[in-house]
UniProtKB/Swiss-Prot annotation:
<keyword id="KW-0479">Metal-binding</keyword>
<feature type="binding site">
    <location>
        <position position="231"/>
    </location>
    <ligand>
        <name>Zn(2+) 3</name>
    </ligand>
</feature>
<feature type="binding site">
    <location>
        <position position="216"/>
    </location>
    <ligand>
        <name>Zn(2+) 2</name>
    </ligand>
</feature>
<dbReference type="GO" id="GO:0008081">
    <property type="term" value="F:phosphoric diester hydrolase activity"/>
</dbReference>
<dbReference type="InterPro" id="IPR018246">
    <property type="entry name" value="AP_endonuc_F2_Zn_BS"/>
</dbReference>
<dbReference type="InterPro" id="IPR013022">
    <property type="entry name" value="Xyl_isomerase-like_TIM-brl"/>
</dbReference>
<keyword id="KW-0234">DNA repair</keyword>
<dbReference type="GO" id="GO:0008270">
    <property type="term" value="F:zinc ion binding"/>
</dbReference>
<feature type="binding site">
    <location>
        <position position="182"/>
    </location>
    <ligand>
        <name>Zn(2+) 3</name>
    </ligand>
</feature>
<feature type="binding site">
    <location>
        <position position="109"/>
    </location>
    <ligand>
        <name>Zn(2+) 1</name>
    </ligand>
</feature>
<keyword id="KW-0862">Zinc</keyword>
<feature type="binding site">
    <location>
        <position position="179"/>
    </location>
    <ligand>
        <name>Zn(2+) 2</name>
    </ligand>
</feature>
<comment type="function">
    <text>Endonuclease IV plays a role in DNA repair. It cleaves phosphodiester bonds at apurinic or apyrimidinic (AP) sites, generating a 3'-hydroxyl group and a 5'-terminal sugar phosphate.</text>
</comment>
<protein>
    <recommendedName>
        <fullName>Probable endonuclease 4</fullName>
        <ecNumber>3.1.21.2</ecNumber>
    </recommendedName>
</protein>
<dbReference type="InterPro" id="IPR036237">
    <property type="entry name" value="Xyl_isomerase-like_sf"/>
</dbReference>
<dbReference type="InterPro" id="IPR001719">
    <property type="entry name" value="AP_endonuc_2"/>
</dbReference>
<dbReference type="GO" id="GO:0008833">
    <property type="term" value="F:deoxyribonuclease IV (phage-T4-induced) activity"/>
</dbReference>
Length: 279
């Protein structure tokens, strides 16, 4: 089964996210459980929590079809101790919010060294941050998203993600979300048929499909290897539609949330239909 959806708005309360997903014919969805550009947020009310769970039940969204996304402000590899502790506390809060809502997957960007520490110590700090969060929470998997490698962001190379996973103590609660735009911008060829198969052979060898918990399906405005993160609507960028057809026809991508983060929400319903037509 292919679970296809988009990162929908939770404006007015998290309980609105499942409804917004239903309106575009989605069988999966992503959401922010709080304002993604603020450190602090009001605690979730009992009304919102019950409303979210009831909407998911009514519309048929199980935990494996929902991929929460954490705040953009969080940097679990921050070289400054005070800023790191602030990020770690915010990440635990994000995990706890997922726990309250019955969401089992929290997607996050691994972190950045900011040009102030070497890569390996930064990766170790990210892993330590994950360990601390997992110790303080339960039932939620920390899902590392690969990045485009823009600026000093880490996680653009599969081996960097593997290094983080190797240092996470509870391997049952860590996973990976692959973003097609990020992968392509980081230099992984998803466009050609040979490159597509080679990329996922590499992913399986270095990380392993057992860790794949979700995907972001985005075209890219930039060339392969550009290390620039700019999403495009499906078929309107440098990737084209072929990679997305391959993903739809490949059973390795079954039973995980496949989430659009394409820039035009008015196209999401038709993009979902396009993807379904490949099945």
């Amino acid at each position: 089964m292919k679970y296809i959806g988009a990162h929908v708005s939770a404006a007015g309360g998290v309980e609105n996210a499942p409804k917004n997903a239903g309106l575009i014919g989605a069988t999966a969805f992503a959401l922010f459980t709080k304002n993604q550009r603020q450190w602090k947020a009001k605690t979730l009310t009992e009304k919102s929590i019950l409303g979210f769970k009831e909407a998911c039940r009514t519309l048929g969204y199980g935990p494996g079809q929902i991929l929460a996304h954490d705040s953009y402000l969080i940097n679990l590899g921050h070289p400054d101790r005070e800023s790191l502790e602030k990020s770690r506390a915010a990440f635990v809060d994000e995990m706890e919010r997922c726990q309250q809502l019955g969401i089992s997957l929290l997607n996050f960007h691994p972190g950045s060294h900011l040009g102030r520490i070497d890569i390996d110590p930064c990766l170790a700090t990210i892993a330590a941050s994950i360990n601390l969060a997992l110790e303080q929470t339960q039932d939620v998997t920390a899902v590392i998203e690969n990045t485009a490698g823009q600026g000093t962001n880490l996680g653009f190379d599969f081996s960097q993600i593997r290094t983080i996973i190797d240092q996470v103590e509870d391997k049952t609660r860590v996973g990976v979300c692959l973003d097609t735009c990020h992968s392509f911008s980081a230099g992984y060829d998803l466009k050609s048929e040979h490159g597509f198969h080679q990329t996922f052979e590499t992913f399986d060898r270095v990380i392993g499909f057992d860790y794949l918990k979700g995907m972001h399906l985005n075209d890219s405005t930039k060339a392969m290897g550009s290390r620039v993160d700019r999403h495009a609507s499906l078929g309107q960028g440098t990737l084209g539609m072929a990679p997305f057809e391959r993903i739809m026809k490949d059973t390795r991508f079954d039973n995980i949330p496949l989430i659009l983060e394409t820039p035009d929400p008015s196209l999401w319903a038709s993009e979902i239909q396009q993807l379904r037509a490949f099945l």
